[in-house]
């Protein structure tokens, strides 16, 4: 079982945790057990389930194509990981936070029956229109999924998603509930026991909070921003609390966006961003820092019921 209930802690951060990092875009609290999270929650209950197609502007489409889906090898690798554990032909797969739908499109080509959840109007519209996919703008915790699709899917995936949700334990329980017995839950997410987070902690401490470096790129109090970063141990405990047997947990190197995206979060000057880009590119070619983790869990017969109240 989880040593602490992170969802309960997040509802009362000042009572159950202490403020440790005051960042440019977020206040990061740390619980007694070590959970790191911001005090911001997305207004999910105010989001309409209808997809507003007018939000898919040319600028938004360009962002999806040149930034969000720029690393095509990343999506191909995700297909490879899933196919290692599950024959894709006719498999029912749900991707939570499916973005522009590229992964679902690739899975569909392999014969999978795919469905996506995306709460961003522009991304949901892009995935539905450009890839002709079934996309729903309803959170996994809603009755639509919990009552209509309980025990339905062979696999549920959350790629770079669990760090964005309001209540991660509730999200994982809800995802486990829509899995068949023996079904798979696959997650990748930034890892707190990594070089970047540790360096950020050190520079913040040594500078008295003036130079958080990587921490500024890892947490955000903006809509759908990073609300929590987990350690590998915490993620393993969360899976276990949801009745999921961890069959794979590994750290690996991956950048979800182009180098420029991260440099802009670290450096305020466009000139410095352009100056540092070639050095950063060379650095990552030499050193594959394991900044993320992949966790694969299999649903056992005894699963904790999802509490979506």
Spans of features found by a protein language model:
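A short linear boundary/processing microfeature
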Residues: 130-133, 181, 205
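Surface-exposed loop/turn positions
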Residues: 91, 182-183
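S-adenosyl-L-methionine-dependent methyltransferase catalytic module, highlighting the catalytic core
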Residues: 166-177, 184-303
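A short His-aromatic
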Residues: 160, 164
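Conserved N-terminal segment of class I S-adenosyl-L-methionine
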Residues: 1-159, 169-172, 251-254, 260-264, ...
């Amino acid at each position: 079982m989880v040593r602490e209930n992170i969802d309960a802690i997040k509802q009362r951060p000042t009572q159950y945790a202490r403020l440790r990092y005051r960042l440019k875009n977020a206040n990061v609290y740390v619980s007694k057990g070590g959970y790191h999270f911001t005090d911001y929650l997305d207004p999910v209950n105010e989001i309409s389930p209808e997809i507003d197609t007018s939000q898919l502007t040319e600028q938004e489409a360009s962002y999806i194509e040149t930034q969000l889906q720029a690393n095509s090898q990343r999506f191909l690798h995700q297909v490879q990981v899933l196919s290692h554990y599950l024959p894709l032909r006719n498999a029912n797969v749900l991707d939570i936070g499916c973005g522009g739908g590229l992964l679902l499109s690739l899975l569909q080509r392999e014969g999978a029956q795919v469905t996506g959840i995306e709460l961003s109007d522009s991304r949901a519209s892009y995935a539905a229109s450009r890839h002709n996919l079934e996309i729903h703008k309803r959170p996994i915790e809603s009755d639509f999924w919990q009552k209509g699709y309980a025990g339905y899917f062979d696999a549920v995936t959350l790629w770079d998603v669990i760090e964005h949700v309001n209540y991660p334990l509730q999200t994982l329980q809800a995802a486990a509930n829509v899995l068949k017995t023996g079904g798979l839950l696959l997650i990748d997410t930034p890892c707190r026991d990594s070089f970047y987070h540790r360096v950020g902690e050190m520079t913040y401490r040594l500078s008295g909070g003036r130079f958080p470096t990587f921490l500024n790129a890892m947490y955000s109090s903006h809509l759908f921003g990073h609300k929590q970063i987990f350690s590998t141990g915490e993620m393993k405990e969360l899976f276990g609390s949801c009745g999921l047997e961890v069959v794979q947990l590994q750290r690996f190197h991956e950048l979800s966006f182009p180098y420029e995206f991260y440099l802009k979060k670290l450096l305020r000057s466009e000139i410095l961003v352009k100056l540092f880009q070639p050095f950063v590119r060379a650095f990552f070619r030499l050193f594959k820092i394991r900044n993320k983790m992949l966790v694969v869990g299999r649903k056992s017969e005894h699963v904790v019921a999802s509490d979506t109240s």
